């Protein structure tokens, strides 16, 4: 499926709503009654910058998260109040906990905090876990492990933490950590089981939690989306692993690689990304959505700009 690039949602413009905060991908508006309006844009970010807008990306993220929030509501309460638009989630405003719960089922990753990066440097003890010698890249771990990280301020990098460090720094209480750990591992187990039914491997993911007005722990942000998770195609995993090849995935890194080959992306201006590359990224997101959820992606009406539709649907929801 090819979507029209001019209809991509790059800038969210809702001046009538209060308390605006723009993240890398999502724009948030805090309403006086405790609800938060979360609009997923089509922005594709890397190198701490926005590279381009990928048509359909925000809708894929919102609707994939919706699929998983619905599928895991029996495990853990979540922040969802309503979905007035394919790109919009209305959530409960929470007091966010300052730790991200990353769960990993495989020795994988490319970031400085990933267990594969640390393992290849010779480290065997990380995040309070000891890994055996002799593991290979992308190998399944004996069991899923929690690898928490601190939530870095803008411009800083997340720092790896052991459970003991989480508690020593007072990021959460011991009782909260016990509940967070149980929730994260149960959510991951459900995700892996459902992904397997779809011919996929959920290799790793991250969860964010907050506290509601009663102090209860609530799942926030997103869950098992193509941005927060690593999904591989199960049918080719074993053969590719034995051959020392990377697992087949819904890889979007080709946009990042194209930019990195042409400039210093941290300091130079970003060159205009070709339309065919953006269309390819859009197709990957849509393929991922359909593979993960088993649903058919409902392409937006090209005759109405996405921002106009978002505003129309939000106006109707908030007036109701």
Swiss-Prot record:
Pathway listed: Purine metabolism; IMP biosynthesis via de novo pathway; 5-amino-1-(5-phospho-D-ribosyl)imidazole-4-carboxamide from 5-amino-1-(5-phospho-D-ribosyl)imidazole-4-carboxylate: step 1/2
The keyword Ligase is assigned to this record: yes
Xref: Pfam families: SAICAR_synt (PF01259)
The protein's Enzyme Commission number: 6.3.2.6
Root EC class: ligase
Keyword terms of this UniProt record: ATP-binding, Ligase, Nucleotide-binding, Purine biosynthesis
Gene Ontology CC annotations of this record: cytoplasm
Catalytic activity: 5-amino-1-(5-phospho-D-ribosyl)imidazole-4-carboxylate + L-aspartate + ATP = (2S)-2-[5-amino-1-(5-phospho-beta-D-ribosyl)imidazole-4-carboxamido]succinate + ADP + phosphate + 2 H(+)
Gene Ontology MF term list: ATP binding; phosphoribosylaminoimidazolesuccinocarboxamide synthase activity
Gene Ontology BP annotations: 'de novo' IMP biosynthetic process
Sections of the chain in a coiled coil: none
Top-level division of the source organism's lineage: Bacteria
CDD domains (UniProt xref): SAICAR_synt_Sc
Record InterPro entries: SAICAR_synt/ADE2_N, SAICAR_synthetase_CS
Family, per entry: Belongs to the SAICAR synthetase family.
Protein's name according to its UniProt entry: Putative phosphoribosylaminoimidazole-succinocarboxamide synthase 2
């Amino acid at each position: 499926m090819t979507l029209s690039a001019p209809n991509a949602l790059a800038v969210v413009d809702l001046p009538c709503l209060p308390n605006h905060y723009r993240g890398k991908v999502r724009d948030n508006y805090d309403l006086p009654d405790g609800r938060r309006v979360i609009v997923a844009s089509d922005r594709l970010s890397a190198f701490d910058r926005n590279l381009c807008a990928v048509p359909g990306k925000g809708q894929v993220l919102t609707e994939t998260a919706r699929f998983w929030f619905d599928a895991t509501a029996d495990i853990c309460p979540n922040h969802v109040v309503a979905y007035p638009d394919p790109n919009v989630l209305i959530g409960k405003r929470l007091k966010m906990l300052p730790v991200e719960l990353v769960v990993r089922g495989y020795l994988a990753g490319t970031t400085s905090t990933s267990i594969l990066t640390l393992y290849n440097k010779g480290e065997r003890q990380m995040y309070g876990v000891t890994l055996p010698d002799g593991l290979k890249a992308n190998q399944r771990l004996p069991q899923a492990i929690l690898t928490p990280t601190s939530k870095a301020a803008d411009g800083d990098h997340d720092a790896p933490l052991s459970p003991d460090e989480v508690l020593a720094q007072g990021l959460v209480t011991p009782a909260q950590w016990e509940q967070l750990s149980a929730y994260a591992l149960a959510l991951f187990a459900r995700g892996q089981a459902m992904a397997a039914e779809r011919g996929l491997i959920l290799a790793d993911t991250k969860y964010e939690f907050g506290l509601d007005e009663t102090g209860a722990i609530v799942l926030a942000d997103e869950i098992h989306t193509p941005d927060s998770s690593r999904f591989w195609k199960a049918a080719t995993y074993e053969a590719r692993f034995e051959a020392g090849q990377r697992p087949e995935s819904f890889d979007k890194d080709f946009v990042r690689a194209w930019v990195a080959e042409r400039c210093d992306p941290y300091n130079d201006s970003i060159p205009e990304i070709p339309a065919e590359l953006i269309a390819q990224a859009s197709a990957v997101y849509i393929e991922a959505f359909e593979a993960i959820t088993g649903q058919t992606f409902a392409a937006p009406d090209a005759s109405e700009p996405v921002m106009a539709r978002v505003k129309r649907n939000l106006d109707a929801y908030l007036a109701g």
